[in-house]
């Protein structure tokens, strides 16, 4: 778990085969040079053909998961990879400006510092870094005009307890059981959707995939409300039968 592996396949649904470890030019795998724990990798290819890897995990109180590694104290790490093999590091690691917990104090990131689940998107020339915060139940975003630096906190995208919406100031008032979440944003036919997961049966191991349309105006995303019908355009009619 200290390294990042790559698997390849000719079809997106599999069957995948091991391809190699992401490595430095000297052949040593990332994670083997005493870097912070490599976790939840996200890949982004920019319009100019440059390829970036984002990774990181900030929770110090999980010794089993960390397995002797150290958590990141400075937010997510970025590596530029060689697009010809998608394995070899050209530049990095570097930190992109999304604050860790200690660094967030007194900044817009305070209360929403980086935990895990790195994902990069680009809309209308602006880079949007999407991540799960130390609150765990929410996805937030930060923006920059560069994929490798200068990210400023943007806001909450979604919470699997609707924490942050009107009347839901904190987890104690959450509309349902909360837990960690991972996800990202997709633009489809001019509309934007946030994909994430919630937890059913009050168990962290029972993760249910979710999606909501999200409002996007003047470069800003506004927190989406969690529903069960995010891709249906509204509630189901309650007629007939529906697949689970």
Predicted regions and their residues:
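Carbohydrate-active catalytic/glycan-binding domains of CAZyme proteins
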Residues: 1-244
């Amino acid at each position: 778990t200290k390294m990042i592996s790559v698997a390849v396949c000719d079809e997106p649904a599999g069957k995948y085969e091991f391809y190699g470890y992401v490595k430095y030019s000297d052949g040593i795998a990332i994670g083997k040079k005493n870097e912070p724990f490599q976790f939840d990798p996200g890949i982004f290819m920019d319009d100019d053909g440059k390829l970036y890897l984002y990774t990181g995990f900030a929770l110090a109180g999980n010794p089993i998961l960390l397995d002797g590694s150290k958590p990141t104290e400075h937010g997510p790490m970025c590596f530029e990879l060689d697009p010809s093999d998608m394995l070899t590091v050209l530049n990095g690691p570097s930190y992109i400006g999304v604050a860790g917990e200690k660094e967030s104090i007194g900044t817009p990131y305070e209360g929403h510092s980086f935990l895990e689940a790195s994902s990069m998107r680009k809309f209308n020339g602006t880079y949007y870094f999407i991540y799960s915060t130390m609150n765990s139940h929410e996805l937030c975003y930060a923006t920059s005009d560069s994929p490798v630096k200068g990210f400023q906190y943007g806001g909450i995208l979604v919470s699997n307890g609707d924490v942050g919406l009107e009347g839901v100031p904190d987890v104690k008032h959450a509309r349902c059981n909360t837990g960690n979440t991972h996800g990202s944003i997709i633009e489809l036919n001019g509309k934007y959707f946030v994909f994430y997961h919630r937890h059913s049966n009050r168990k962290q191991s029972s993760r249910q995939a979710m999606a909501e349309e999200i409002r996007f105006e003047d470069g800003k995303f506004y927190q989406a409300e969690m529903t069960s019908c995010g891709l249906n355009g509204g509630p189901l009619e309650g007629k007939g039968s529906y697949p689970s």
